[in-house]
Each structure stands twice: as structure tokens, then as C-alpha cells.
Amino acid sequence: MGTLVGFGSLANIPEEKITDSITRRVLSGEKCMMVSWNIKSGTHAAAHSHPHEQIVWMIKGKCEARVSTERRILNAGDVAVIAGGVEHELWFQEDTELVDIFAPPREDFLAGGEPTWLQKENR
């Protein structure tokens, strides 16, 4: 997990290989966390929830997202805000780069843990 005070480059934050289809770079401050993801087409982020508020910013690619009972297609440039405690999941239809912002920071990610949505099928 990367920490930074002041200025820097995302490229200098170590990339973690989660599976053959998922990598991430984690940068955390005291009150929020940014996670840059690279996720291959065909990956499913299984239904899950967490107490953290989450903002999703699609940089590249395409996915179908479900937040509670609402479904949307997200493309590059799209954003979504997910309240803490709300169930959500994503199906990645193209190789995708996205940025998640979490507040407060995800304790499981600080410890280097796998995402709660990781399913056996994604390995």
C-alpha cells in the first residue's frame, strides 16, 4: 500500500497482482483511500457491501453495474457514488481501468487483503 504526502505519480505506487485478471495500486490518506484498478474483460465483482462510501470513476473500458436494484452500463468518463452499506456488483465487459475512492479507508485493503467481491471464478 502506498502512502504519499505532497505530490507524486501513480506510476510510482507499487502495483499488486490480485489475480491473473486483476491488479491494483492503493494510496491511502488518513480519511480517504484511492484504488486504481486494472480489470480484464469477463471478470465479475460479486455482490457485496461495505460500510465505506465509494466513488467509482471509469477511466477506460466498459462494465455493467448494479447498485441496490438499479443497473447501468458504465463507460469511460462515467462515475457512480455508492453509499456505505448498499449492495453492489459489476460485470466487466471490456478490459477496464477505473479509480475507486473510499471514505474512510478500507481496512481490508490497508492490510493487503483481497477484495470482498473476489470470486473463485476470477482466479
How would you name each of these model-derived features?
Residues 38-40, 50-65:
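Short, conserved beta-strand element in jelly-roll/cupin
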Residues 62, 79-81, 111:
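A beta-strand edge to alpha-helix "cap/lid" segment located at domain peripheries
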Residues 69-84:
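Short acidic-glycine-tyrosine-enriched beta hairpin
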Residues 84-108:
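Ligand-binding loop in jelly-roll beta-barrel domains
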